[in-house]
Amino acid sequence: MNTPKSFFWAQEYFTPWDYTARAITRILAYRKTRFQEMLIAETGAYGKGLMLDGHWQSTTADEFLYHEALVHPALVQVVQAGGIPRRVLILGGAEGATLREVLRWRSVEQVVMVDIDGEVVEACREHLPEMHQGSFADPRAEVVIADALDFLGQTEPIWDAILSDLSDPVEAGPAYRLFTQEFFRQVRSKLQTAGAFVIQAGPTGPVELWQHTRIVHTLKTVFAAVQPYAIYAPTYGGPLGFALAAQDPISSRPEPEQVDQILAQHLDPDRGALRFIDGITLLGLYQVPAHLRRAIAAETTVYTLANPPQVE
């Protein structure tokens, strides 16, 4: 195997004692914005990637695992609850890849992406076309540079799905308020009857799952149904959790044939086939392992503005 002559290691810590290292071969953009530290770079093995505050958000090699898992289970849930995903709100999502996945749905008439950091959005638009694939220019898409909490307070309850594609909820970062009970109540009030909400919900590895269990437990104090699930993408160094929430029931054993039929009816074939999500994959994702089920059941902490997520 050929090793580049010039590179340096980008280290990402998961605990004070554990980190992963990824080789950076070229820096495409670096800056400290008003909200966070941003790096867009070419890596040795995983293509281009976005790093915020020292944490990888996505790389071109495996971002499809994350973005398909974030978007399509939620929109399938809307259909299964008797709705049609016409209006979708994305919170965060600077790379434009979440936007890309939403725009696969032919029923979508309007998708608004709200991100607090316009500098990061513009850098991703310039340097990560492999991720957004021109989605920012789609006439159905609108990008709003604003605080998601403020935007939600002003919007009407018109949304069929709200997708939270935010950086990790650390108190020093811009997103920690968006993982609290107060915020989840705001989200619920802005959804249509058959609407669904999905959130990136932290790592689910055995020594890191406390944040995930608290997010899921907090959601359960607000929504009638919550389905946790997780993916493994090498960029993140371990399993990463999500939580899907709705007022209608969410089947933990979705019928693969029905899911495949929904996807076939609603996805635009001109935008290419999904690489990760299908009926069998969704069924597998929803089978939460025993240790995680027990940890969620035992969780008692509720994230609030008075008791927000913190680094532990």
UniProtKB/Swiss-Prot annotation:
Q: Name one GO molecular function term.
A: thermospermine synthase activity
Q: Which terms are listed as keywords in the entry?
A: Cytoplasm, Polyamine biosynthesis, Spermidine biosynthesis, Transferase
Q: Name one GO biological process term.
A: spermidine biosynthetic process
Where along the chain is spermidine bound?
A: 67, 95
Metabolic or biological pathway, per its Swiss-Prot or TrEMBL entry: Amine and polyamine biosynthesis; spermidine biosynthesis; spermidine from putrescine: step 1/1
Q: Which residues bind S-methyl-5'-thioadenosine?
A: 36, 115, 147-148, 174
Q: Does the keyword Nucleotidyltransferase apply?
A: no
Q: What class of enzyme is it?
A: transferase
Q: Which Gene3D superfamilies match?
A: Spermidine synthase, tetramerisation domain, Vaccinia Virus protein VP39
Q: Where in the cell is it found?
A: Cytoplasm
Give the enzyme's EC designation: 2.5.1.16
- HAMAP family with a match to the protein in the record: Spermidine_synth
Quaternary state and partners of this protein?
Homodimer or homotetramer.
Which protein is depicted? Polyamine aminopropyltransferase
Please tell me the species this chain comes from: Synechococcus sp. (strain JA-3-3Ab) (Cyanobacteria bacterium Yellowstone A-Prime)
